[in-house]
Amino acid sequence: MVEVICDTSFLIHLSTHKIKNIDSVNTEIGQIQFVVPSVVLNELKKLSKTQKKKQDAITTLEFARNLKTTEMSGKFADEAIIERVRKRGGIIATLDSELKNKIKSLGGSVMSFSNDRIVLES
């Protein structure tokens, strides 16, 4: 099973949108497991206290209860994720274009959305 580390933006989109190919993603790239870093959960908890993102953050925190979590320390999720890719490589799920470029430059793979479909970028 391939673990896919989710950042905050990807997780919010995954939990608040209808994803067209969610059932077929496993057959396209092998069986995957979305993993939520503890630092992402911390970001979501902070967002749940803001007026603008409150409802999306609460919905996403509830959604994340059904996903595997992993301990990842750091003040900011992007920094922790970049450090993880630097040490271990892997697939990172994000919508953040700056983070995507950094992950790719370090040899990691990126999963994202296109037209509400999950895609693996090259």
Task: Give the positions of each predicted feature.
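Domain-level signal for Mg2+-assisted phosphodiester chemistry and nucleotide/NA-binding surfaces
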Residues: 1-66
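Nuclease catalytic cores that cleave nucleic-acid phosphodiester bonds
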Residues: 39-122
